[in-house]
Amino acid sequence: MSRKTVALAAGGCLIILLVAACAVAVAGLSAFELPSLIAGATATATQTAVSTPTPIPTLTSSPTPVPSPSASATFTPAPSPAAETVATPTAPPGPTKEPKPTPTPWLMQLRDDLPPLRLQDWPRPPDDNGWGIHFQYFNEGDLEVQIARMKELRFKWALVVYGDENFLRMAAPRFKEAGIVVVWRRTLQAHDPYYDWARDIKILQEAGMPPYMQAYNEPTLQAEWDEEQEMDEWLFIDLLLTASRDIYNAGGYVGWQFVEDEWLTDALHALKSHGGERIYRRMFFVPHAYGLNHPPDYDEDVNAVLGFLHYADLFQREIGYVPPMVVGEGGWKYGGDDDNRFPKVDEKLYSEYYAALYNWFRSGVLSNGQPLPDYLFAFCPWILSSPTDPNAFYDSFVGDHAPTKEAIKALPPFKRKFSWGF
């Protein structure tokens, strides 16, 4: 091969080397990659060259300049070493509880043609003296005897327990004839629904008797529930509200009875939340005012014949009004010595205490010196007649309590006076 040919080959090789150097500069190839590139280029150039060795000039690579950041480039600083974080173990989240919706109370459908009653608007017996008695467990033959006894003691009120409509049909006309106003209490347990209030009220109205209806009795006592039925406040209140609605709509007077403040308060609030506020002014309350062996003027707590005052305060506080009250059970425990600060109730005290109680309505003054309140319509203590009860005025196994009955008879006849008159 001629020198000219060799020169051309060497020139071509030099051109290849220059091109490779430019590629290195552009691509930023490292110094370790450059010899391989040169070797590849040399091999390609010498494929057609003669075997005469030709010295290859040494290419000195210049450092590749680092490109300046452009104006549009975003500078990202190298991350600083973060402080070591210790993970705090946490309890796994529990299941999310769905909020329990508050049920909307069912609303009472009440008739709108019954006016609210003032105390003086309520029906009372002729020649009312506020004296009464509790009476139960009667049959037709016994009824005549017991009503005669009530008349002998000049009782004008009675709390009467009845078992069904047949008793009402039998008893109502006889009490009407005797001039005795009755609070009627249907025999029911606290968990029993009752659907015949309207029928019972119609029987009384047809007999000319004011329909004072007591719905249920002492619901906070286990004795008023079946053994298999656990006491359930809201089950009872629902039944009571239903009964109150039915009595009201039938034209009756709605009687409530409680011996525990919380249930009574809850029931009053429930009556309002169910839309039953109209009933407030056509309802009455039946306190049970048992005095144990406390004297008539005892008013330190609810265990007194003055215990109705406690419930009057509760009604005033909760609904701003004290309804009529007819004490349906109460009086003294014959032979009682529950409170050792006071003497045992013997026959002498039994007669003195009852004479003092019934004299409230004649004198217009309670035993503790307070005025007799208009809302206290009557006091019907436990009990007119029972062969098994020591407190019974008649037929008791302990005797007939003759001194007590004589003390009551000794009080002069009178007619109860209210703040508005008789």
Set out the residue ranges of the language-model regions:
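N-terminal Sec-pathway targeting helices
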Residues: 1-16
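Boundary/entry segment of secreted carbohydrate-active catalytic domains
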Residues: 104-164
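Aromatic-rich peripheral "rim/lid" segments of glycoside hydrolase catalytic domains that contact
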Residues: 109-123, 132-140, 339-348, 353-356, ...
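Acidic (Asp/Glu)-rich catalytic clusters
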Residues: 121-125, 145-152, 166-182, 200-209, ...
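Acidic-and-aromatic substrate-binding clefts and catalytic sites of carbohydrate-active enzymes
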Residues: 133-145, 157-170, 187-197, 220-223, ...
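Substrate-binding cleft of extracellular glycoside hydrolase catalytic domains
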Residues: 163, 170-263, 327
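Aromatic- and acid-rich polysaccharide-binding/catalytic face
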Residues: 184, 217, 257-258, 267-308, ...
